């Protein structure tokens, strides 16, 4: 991108933590980046505040009942921003000339449709929505390839692999990729010690500032399991070439090992603004607001194997990847229901993997040929997990 061109960015999920980081980077470069579309699920007041600050051309609220509040709020603020509501409006804007880049940061399966719409329209897609790849990875990558869309991952691990692979013309010489995990707030605890974990403890991540659902996924290691499935789709690697290491300092974000024995790693402070700056400006580099890494001050880098006995969600993700078809969609849907129940205090922490495993073993995988097949599997998995919530033995 030349210095004189202006990249118009749609930030889907603008009121979340990733959206805030994206808007921080965009605001630092008004000469080359503009937030042209902002969306939120139901936080209409927060969306209005962002519109006042960033003055996008369009604002979308997913909850159609809040459309009058958004429309009137924009008018009262004296903004020319056009108000929209509902998923269809989001999809239409993703595919329109209102943007050339989409930050896909809507949490959960709700973000899939707009992500696919952006890919089908050939946009640069900064992908933070893990579920799009886990639920429909083959469909998304195929759609993007056909339309010439560019998928740039912005979670730290896949961004690290992206940067390592793009640093040289050696993608065919990859022996394996190694995703790093912080281990979450409960690293080192035995399984029995996890029974009394509370939602407040689970969302208190030691390194990253994230939303509640992703924080719980990090605590269970499901986040890393989903990233294994993502890496399979993003980089075209079989599961056997994707490993996981626990790295509590969260400074080495991932590594790529080549067949000649060389290993490249990407390091940096744990701040999403770095990876967002990579995606927004690639192949150029721009200031992100994140400081450099002082290895002398950090002192040490530690690595250890993940404990899949205490944290079985990582193993369940490997199982789903090996099974293929709709199994990853089933895994993801069951996990969303289980995590929601945990955050509401309905079940304990250990019930999350128990519920996911129950649904994975109960439902038969199908070939993931169409989006309808995947969405049906998603809905069926949610129903199965909801029914299992009433089963006392799963509430460990």
UniProtKB/Swiss-Prot annotation:
Pathway: Isoprenoid biosynthesis; isopentenyl diphosphate biosynthesis via DXP pathway; isopentenyl diphosphate from 1-deoxy-D-xylulose 5-phosphate: step 1/6. NADPH binds at residues 15-18, 41, 129, 131, 211. Keywords: Isoprene biosynthesis, Manganese, Metal-binding, NADP, Oxidoreductase. The keyword Oxidoreductase applies. Mn(2+) binds at residues 155, 157, 227. GO terms for molecular function: 1-deoxy-D-xylulose-5-phosphate reductoisomerase activity; manganese ion binding; NADPH binding. 1-deoxy-D-xylulose 5-phosphate binds at residues 130, 156-157, 182, 205, 218, 223-224, 227. Its EC number is 1.1.1.267. The keyword Manganese applies. Belongs to the DXR family. Catalyzes the NADPH-dependent rearrangement and reduction of 1-deoxy-D-xylulose-5-phosphate (DXP) to 2-C-methyl-D-erythritol 4-phosphate (MEP). This is 1-deoxy-D-xylulose 5-phosphate reductoisomerase. The gene is dxr.
């Amino acid at each position: 991108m030349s210095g004189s061109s202006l990249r118009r960015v749609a930030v889907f999920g603008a009121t979340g933590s990733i959206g805030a980081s994206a808007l921080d980077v965009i605001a630092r470069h008004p000469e080359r980046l503009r937030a042209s579309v902002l969306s939120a699920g139901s936080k209409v007041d927060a969306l209005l505040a962002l519109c006042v600050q960033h003055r996008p051309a369009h604002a979308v609220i997913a909850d159609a009942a809040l459309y009058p509040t958004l429309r009137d709020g924009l008018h009262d603020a004296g903004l020319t921003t056009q108000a929209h509501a509902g998923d269809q409006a989001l999809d239409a804007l993703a595919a329109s000339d209102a943007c050339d880049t989409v930050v896909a940061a809507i949490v959960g399966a709700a973000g899939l449709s707009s992500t696919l719409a952006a890919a089908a329209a050939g946009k640069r897609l900064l992908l933070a929505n893990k579920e799009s790849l886990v639920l429909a990875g083959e469909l998304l990558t195929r759609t993007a390839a056909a339309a010439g869309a560019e998928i740039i991952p912005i979670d730290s691990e896949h961004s690290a692999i992206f940067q390592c692979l793009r640093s040289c013309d050696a993608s065919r010489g990859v022996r394996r990729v190694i995703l790093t995990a912080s281990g979450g707030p409960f690293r080192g605890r035995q399984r029995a010690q996890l029974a009394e974990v509370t939602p407040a403890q689970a969302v208190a991540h030691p390194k990253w500032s994230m939303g509640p659902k992703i924080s719980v996924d990090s605590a269970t290691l499901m986040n890393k399991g989903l990233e294994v499935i993502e890496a399979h789709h993003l980089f075209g690697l079989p599961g056997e070439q994707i490993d996981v290491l626990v790295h509590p300092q969260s400074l080495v974000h991932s590594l790529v090992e080549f067949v000649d024995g060389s290993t490249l790693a990407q390091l940096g402070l744990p701040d999403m603004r770095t990876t967002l700056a990579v995606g927004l400006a690639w192949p150029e580099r721009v200031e992100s607001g994140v400081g450099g890494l002082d290895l002398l001050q950090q002192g040490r880098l530690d690595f250890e194997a993940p404990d899949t006995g205490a944290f079985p969600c990582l193993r369940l993700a490997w199982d789903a990847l090996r099974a293929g078809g709709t199994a990853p969609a089933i895994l993801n849907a069951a996990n969303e229901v289980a995590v929601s129940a945990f955050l509401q205090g309905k079940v304990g922490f250990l019930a999350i993997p128990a519920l996911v495993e129950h649904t994975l073993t109960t439902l038969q995988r199908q070939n993931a040929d169409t989006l309808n097949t995947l969405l049906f599997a998603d809905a069926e998995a949610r129903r199965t997990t909801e029914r299992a919530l009433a089963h006392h033995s799963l509430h460990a």
